[in-house]
Design a protein with these regions (language model features):
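Formylglycine-dependent sulfatase
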Residues: 1-338
């Protein structure tokens, strides 16, 4: 369908109908009909990839002066923009609902996480039909759409394999393909996975090296390759939301061990170092002042000798979980990937 002829102010975009007399005469050499034209986005419409990392603070990633190495984020930041006043709701479901709809979270029924929904307006975890999700808007404009990873926007009473699926990614959420889990968290070694609305088992066991972040990444790579092979002229929208770094902090030991001893000085020293690096990077103003440590958080020097190694190890595991970069696939498939 010609982009110039498409009226995109109403969704779904009305079907194009032929004007004039329709005849069905096999003997008439002049019998013809309007060609079937598949809907496409406007010329030059880009591919869109949205990555949402869970429970990651402003000062965690090295891209923002944090102590945790995130080289991919650094490369993206070097070629793009970094925002230092990008606000979230500081809650899981509300932030996701706002991001995926472009609306205030109360406007889409997500004033709190789905597990504490009530019948109060703005808090029932039900997105109204008048609020179209971003993925649905793009899909109805000719995009291919897919979601991978965590989905925490489904009302708790609708999370079974029997639905209803109006608030699921591949139901009413606008995503043609979904591979991930429903809810706030899942075991990263033995996750409860859905393919669209069907429960599926991981292809490997933890003993065979399975990890959900690597699995969902592999599925996303496969989906993009299929998309480019079969519909290279059609742009795509991918929403990629791993379970990291929300609890449980499940990460292969090789990743968490990279940070052995890195946090032994404690959080008081760590926050000062991060603050200084953020000034060096220009992320915060030179005259910014470090906020006082909240009284609810004890000073590191007040922690007992028994607790310090435990708390430092928790920080090491978290750091490894954030840095964890999934491989291209299991060993028997890596050779086929560039």
């Amino acid at each position: 369908m010609s982009n110039d002829a498409v009226q995109r102010s109403v969704l779904p975009i009305p079907d194009r109908t032929g004007v004039g007399l329709t005849t069905y005469d096999a003997k008439d050499p002049d019998t013809s009909y309007p060609p079937v034209r598949e809907l496409r986005p406007p010329a030059g419409a880009p591919n869109v990839l949205v990555v949402l990392i869970d429970d990651t603070g402003f000062g965690a990633s090295s891209a923002f002066g944090g102590p945790i190495l995130t080289p991919t984020a650094e490369r993206l930041a070097a070629d793009g923009l970094k925002f230092n006043r990008f606000h979230t709701t500081a809650l899981c479901s509300p932030t996701r609902a706002a991001l995926l709809s472009g609306r205030n979270h109360h406007s889409v029924g997500m004033g709190g996480i789905t597990e504490i929904a009530t019948s109060a307006p703005g808090y029932n975890s039900l997105r109204p039909n008048t609020a179209a999700p971003l993925a649905e808007t793009l899909r109805l404009n000719g995009y291919s759409t897919a979601q991978f990873g965590k989905c925490h926007e489904v009302p708790v009473w609708q999370t079974s394999p029997m639905g209803p699926f109006d608030n699921w990614p591949s139901g009413g959420g606008g995503f043609e393909y979904f591979y991930g889990f429903i809810g706030g968290e899942t075991n990263q070694y033995a996750p409860a996975i859905y393919h669209n609305t069907t429960p599926v088992e991981p292809e490997r066991t933890p003993e065979e090296g399975y990890h959900f972040t690597e699995d969902m990444t592999d599925k996303a790579i496969d989906w993009v390759r299929q998309q480019k092979a079969l519909m290279s002229d059609k742009p795509f929208f991918i929403y990629f939301a791993p379970g990291a770094t929300h609890a449980p902090h499940h990460v292969p030991p090789g990743w968490s061990d990279r940070y052995k001893g890195k946090f032994d000085a404690g959080w008081d020293q760590l926050r000062k170092q991060t603050f200084a690096r953020q000034k060096e990077l220009g992320i915060i103003p030179d005259d910014a002042e470090l906020t006082a440590r909240p009284p609810e958080i004890p000073a590191w020097e007040d922690m007992s000798a028994e607790m310090k190694p435990i708390l430092a190890r928790q920080m090491e595991v978290y750091a490894g979980f954030l840095e964890h970069r999934p491989p291209r696939g299991p060993p028997d498939r890596r050779a086929s990937r560039p």
